[in-house]
Amino acid sequence: MKLQSILSCWAILVAQIWATTDGLTDLVAWDPYSLTVNGNRLFVYSGEFHYPRLPVPEMWLDVFQKMRAHGFNAVSLYFFWDYHSPINGTYDFETGAHNIQRLFDYAQEAGIYIIARAGPYCNAEFNGGGLALYLSDGSGGELRTSDATYHQAWTPWIERIGKIIADNSITNGGPVILNQIENELQETTHSASNTLVEYMEQIEEAFRAAGVDVPFTSNEKGQRSRSWSTDYEDVGGAVNVYGLDSYPGGLSCTNPSTGFSVLRNYYQWFQNTSYTQPEYLPEFEGGWFSAWGADSFYDQCTSELSPQFADVYYKNNIGQRVTLQNLYMLYGGTNWGHLAAPVVYTSYDYSAPLRETRQIRDKLSQTKLVGLFTRVSSGLLGVEMEGNGTSYTSTTSAYTWVLRNPNTTAGFYVVQQDTTSSQTDITFSLNVNTSAGAFTLPNINLQGRQSKVISTDYPLGHSTLLYVSTDIATYGTFGDTDVVVLYARSGQVVSFAFKNTTKLTFEEYGDSVNLTSSSGNRTITSYTYTQGSGTSVVKFSNGAIFYLVETETAFRFWAPPTTTDPYVTAEQQIFVLGPYLVRNVSISGSVVDLVGDNDNATTVEVFAGSPAKAVKWNGKEITVTKTDYGSLVGSIGGADSSSITIPSLTGWKVRDSLPEIQSSYDDSKWTVCNKTTTLSPVDPLSLPVLFASDYGYYTGIKIYRGRFDGTNVTGANLTAQGGLAFGWNVWLNGDLVASLPGDADETSSNAAIDFSNHTLKQTDNLLTVVIDYTGHDETSTGDGVENPRGLLGATLNGGSFTSWKIQGNAGGAAGAYELDPVRAPMNEGGLLAERQGWHLPGYKAKSSDGWTDGSPLDGLNKSGVAFYLTTFTLDLPKKYDVPLGIQFTSPSTVDPVRIQLFINGYQYGKYVPYLGPQTTFPIPPGIINNRDKNTIGLSLWAQTDAGAKLENIELISYGAYESGFDAGNGTGFDLNGAKLGYQPEWTEARAKYT
């Protein structure tokens, strides 16, 4: 005990010495153990969310509420420069889903803090890594350095976004507690004069000048360097709290036995790099992105989706003293329009815990159990590493992390398989030290890929657990009653003991677990049970109540806080068992008012303390009975699938969307390619410069028309670049002469075209080139955003081009923003259908304009682009959340085809079946109207003269949930995007973009 007292005094002294602020506010402070927010130590349990990938602000609250319900107290947010600044000098933080004030407000309403990450560079598999796309012409100087031209380019962005972050920081009553500087920028040279050091200092100064006064953070790109820590060769540019990104899974979607080997060197890494700071993982693997041509889609990647990953990896981080953890991603969302960098396709599901459809995966449920534990386990926020290895158990097949809090004597033993990829069951005993001496805990079982946090001297409200040999989900204090929730897998043996108590009597309720007690030769009584299926309850004579819950049953256990503060104590939560989701709770007198979602009718059990006598579910009181141990039990309904009707997609109209291949097409209003120089770091292969960005066209399909005279030209050499998996075609005087379907591994390709089998004219021969676009590169690829898109060069064999013209989205970025600031220029490309707005609600498909009856199931019998249009009406039940999507099916023999899907004007899918893997495309409420008319459009690009068609296209539902969700407008998920201003209609202004 003397040693423990000495350690306790030493820890307090060290904490006092090392407790640090940024000198601007003491509302957020830190020491080697944790962050302190508003005077409270906080285990930061955060998830990454990219609001542009869910462009319906009301749905942001849905995600935040689900995060809060699953134990999260923070969200990490990138703010993408290119998303808010489509053209130089324009910054939009107000229109539609660009209105980020709603983001801050919803986070605060949900009760979660914000970690702001505004770059200027973000990465994130986002178009150009988030850098403004108007820099893609080379006008931005030396990107991500202290270069003066680049500095001048990004400064207005930080001035504007910085002020918004400052206004919403905790110092101004907002939710922002941390602000990240840049993104994964490696400090390769520790020198004060290094351009990266100067660059970091420039950004930090800019944020401070904008009023941001919360601590700065960084994120190291894996263990590749040691960057920006005040504790490691600090020559300038260091941040307040160093962070390390890690994606250690090494998992395979096609071989689930691959990988699953945890890293065990985080603790030592942080001790060597940032020993005066808490251990922070700004990006820890919540999933992984899938690329074009992948062998499987996210929904099929069982290795990434497994709850076992969350169980083992997130507890492994706890074992290494991590107290700030952000899961990347928590919710991935959708790369609608042209948000994606070329490394990903439309879906950004990321195999994240919360599915792209906003549905709860088992992985999220397991993640919740970790989050609820860290929420109330204050003893974790002051632990020292006592030891680690295989010597703490009766078998070397088990590995243990041993943490001890010198202030409270609480201990945490994180046990896992020594070989974490093992799928073999092991049973062993664990040696633990407690305030009452050493104990050997027997019969601890790990079923393959499983981990447990075994706690000792764990304080409850009115008593202390001396030890417990399974996981604590959470505990609550209800007046004089402690309620503890333990979870284990069926068949696993659990033992626990109270500290300083005589032998207690107890009563069992529910499915019997045959709890037994044994004192042996000590005054300590050990209680042992074998976990059965479902839930059992034990009430002890000291008033303590234990819920003994099977792990899978615990997936539907909830601990909604009774406060909106992100900091939640054991006295500020109640317990609910049964529903699909409990969003929040309020208590008025004896009435417990629950708001949540449910799929199927179920029993609901509520423990809220002795004052509680009635329960409301989504505003309606339900009949409840009180159990002998004090909970209230009733029944709630679910969604009625028979009330949901999903219409077929019929009544299609079709029109040619590539008349530009015909010589007679009038391109007099097109942009002339006449530049002979470029700022691009990439040299053009011919003149004039044909890089699309040099002419103000950044996103989407590009169309070129090149003319030449003479019949002696024998061929052409063209090089195009559109990003990974792009494809392109070339027509000569209306005839297809080159088809390059695309390759998932190719960013650019060359076409050597032979004209020998084609008729040329004496004058005005026309070469039409259509080039797809999968995004601008991140800086990990060559020159990043400055890698040109479009034609890199074009030459003739035996002649010269007399002119080149280019067409992209309507009016380029500037014109497209003027036409549609809500969806913004990243939504569209250069097809005639897109330029003229055929995809928009309110557009009339008139036969006089060339529209005829025609289905995408009939398709094209030659190369070209057809645009298909129809409408459908939904009448889904009010107060239902019915995630919807579009599913494509292609013929067994797939001809090269590229399809863009438009829903109410939003490009919400790129379907390329011969590359894959995506075939289904979720559409959120507000983009699709659940109780109104919807417009759907398809551009079908047949890349060969064999033509192309679909086998089927249908509207599908992913599930149905009766819900009490409300974003403040009383409509729940009945979000009419048109009425909310998210679906601007077609206007005559589109007609001029021919």
Swiss-Prot record:
What EC number(s) does the entry state?
3.2.1.23
Q: Which UniProt keywords apply?
A: Carbohydrate metabolism, Disulfide bond, Glycoprotein, Glycosidase, Hydrolase, Polysaccharide degradation, Secreted, Signal
Q: Where is the active site?
A: 184, 283
The protein's location, in the record's own words, is: Secreted
Q: Which reaction does it catalyse?
A: Hydrolysis of terminal non-reducing beta-D-galactose residues in beta-D-galactosides
The entry marks the following residues as binding substrate, namely: 78, 123-125, 183, 247, 350
The SS bond pairs are 253-301
Membrane-crossing residues?
none
MF terms per GO, please?
A: beta-galactosidase activity
Kindly state a single biological-process term from the GO annotations of this entry: polysaccharide catabolic process
Instruction: Report whether Endoplasmic reticulum shows up as a keyword of the record.
Output: no
| Glycan attachment residues as annotated in the record | 88, 272, 388, 407, 433, 500, 514, 521, 584, 600, 674, 712, 717, 757, 861, 969
**What are the boundaries of the signal sequence?**
1-19
GO CC term (a single one): extracellular region
The cross-references to PANTHER family, in alphabetical order and at most eight, read:
BETA-GALACTOSIDASE RELATED
**Its biological purpose:** Cleaves beta-linked terminal galactosyl residues from gangliosides, glycoproteins, and glycosaminoglycans.
Name of protein: Probable beta-galactosidase C
Organism, scientific name: Aspergillus niger (strain ATCC MYA-4892 / CBS 513.88 / FGSC A1513)
Highest lineage ranks of the organism?
Eukaryota, Fungi, Dikarya, Ascomycota, Pezizomycotina
